[in-house]
Amino acid sequence: IAGAFVLSASIAQADIKPAVVYDIAGKNDQSFNEAVFVGITKYMNDTGIAVTELEPTNAAQVEQSLKKLASRGYEPIVAVGFAMANAVQAAAEAYPDTKFTLIDMVVGLPNVQNVLYKEHEGSFLVGVLAAMNSETGTVGFVGGMDIPLISRFECGYKQGVNWQDSSMNVLANMTGSTPAAFGNPSKGGELTRTQIQNGADVVYAAAGGTGSGVYQAAADAGVLAIGVDSNQNWMQPGTMLTSMLKRVGEAAYDSYEAANNGTWEAGFRILGLAEDGVGWALDEYNRDLITPEMEARVNEARDAIIAGDIVVHDYMADSSCPI
């Protein structure tokens, strides 16, 4: 399988043989996959245990990669992204004694740990920031693939915008209807330019690698953008308002750590603001854009969500958005 390599020779010292299969966007997508890669790199540095990494280049290779690793005794095997669900189902059925951890989707088998996130909660927070920074009264959203998971980001964002200012207008577009929509920066830029022409002065991208085109278009027009998954503030310093953090790297790290100490469990881990699974990024790249008032307001919203005083509607619960 293309992209297979071992980063360290220390694996013989470990009780586990951890592995990961990235999705076809690859671990250098500067977004979702890269966030997992960062977490895995930290695990290797912290423990000295090598993690075998496979990067399939097409959908057919995903199942092959998972089965290849399982046949060679690797576990737990982390599968990155919703698109891997069918492949994980097949591999986990074929290798029922192998532990699999699936990020962002559900496979209901006794050897699969499913890690899910409350993206709507994190998106609510960046929606508050978008509303506080807009001067036109219009903000934008560019999603990747048109699926319920991405609509969850969009709906949470809209609720945050509305909570801060109910008079705001939110423009929203999806990039496409296949997984390729997460790797199309030119289309992302095109959609963003259209939104800007229609008045948007803050644009949130939940689109994987497509986001780089969104951020470039925003920077070119002198408007603000919001990143996703990993901290993308560095990509366009000065126009990146923040990033909605989805701590998927920690999911991989925790899976390996739990397997190594005997506490790994199949089933579900659902991570929101209360679990620090999602959040927003504040660092040297956007510090000057975030006023004390903005920071206080976002923290107010965060605390209210954790306390249950604000309930952010989950689009995936009923395929609807109240905003």
Language model feature labels by segment:
Residues 1-2, 12:
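Cleavable N-terminal signal peptides
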